[in-house]
Amino acid sequence: MATQALVSSSSLTFAAEAVRQSFRARSLPSSVGCSRKGLVRAAATPPVKQGGVDRPLWFASKQSLSYLDGSLPGDYGFDPLGLSDPEGTGGFIEPRWLAYGEVINGRFAMLGAVGAIAPEYLGKVGLIPQETALAWFQTGVIPPAGTYNYWADNYTLFVLEMALMGFAEHRRFQDWAKPGSMGKQYFLGLEKGFGGSGNPAYPGGPFFNPLGFGKDEKSLKELKLKEVKNGRLAMLAILGYFIQGLVTGVGPYQNLLDHVADPVNNNVLTSLKFH
């Protein structure tokens, strides 16, 4: 976690001095054989060694590099608001919870990004009936935007959904607060599969990693990085779905088809009336 950067005062002093020299555009010692510019740039920045981890830096600052040591998947020192700073005014939420929440929300976003566009796409290719091939905002999740005819009324479905999700989220929080505790509580004889790995974000086991991915540390590290990157992209995609729905009134797949058919008249600028 981010607080690992504070374990060794000597390594922190060295890291802070390296960052200070880079901001002053000073050359590193000749033994290193390279020099750095005064600004820490975005993804184009060459990998640097900070806290023992080689990584590119994205608009990192001296302060953010004091607690973001590269130990987290997808950590490039980017924290302009100081949300992960354990001692700063921005750190009003525990950094460990923020890192955990990003992974969980990224997984939900990846499922949502696919689930929101799937019915629309399947309807276009004729795999499901047109009456169910609806844009995501017309399925009843936003009542004014669409109607539906399910087995129960919307209030019953809402209460049922909240009860089921609330139970699952409560169990997940229990495991975060006390890792491994779910494997000690009886749960229909399945509790052994919920024992976890000691890391609540990556519980593993037959239910959460049935294919046994990440059997060694190197492959597990690569998979964690890929998951975080795709999760961040999916969260942006969900935001894009919302904006598209509000602006154009059609689903994301139809927006894509319209853009491909006529990119000059169907794009971000024309949709937002910047023309």
UniProtKB/Swiss-Prot annotation:
Annotated residues for binding of chlorophyll a 6: 259
Chain positions recorded as chlorophyll b 2 binding sites: 107, 142
Residues reported in the UniProt entry to bind chlorophyll b 1: 58
Residue sites binding chlorophyll a 4 per the record: 230
Amino-acid positions noted as binding chlorophyll b 4 in the UniProt annotation, renumbered to this chain: 172
Membrane topology value: Single-pass membrane protein
PTM statement from Swiss-Prot or TrEMBL: Photoregulated by reversible phosphorylation of its threonine residues.
Binding site for chlorophyll a 5: 226, 244
GO molecular function: chlorophyll binding; metal ion binding
Localization terms from the record: Plastid, Chloroplast thylakoid membrane
Subunit structure: The LHC complex consists of chlorophyll a-b binding proteins.
Similarity comment: Belongs to the light-harvesting chlorophyll a/b-binding (LHC) protein family.
Protein's recorded name: Chlorophyll a-b binding protein 3, chloroplastic
Source species: Pisum sativum
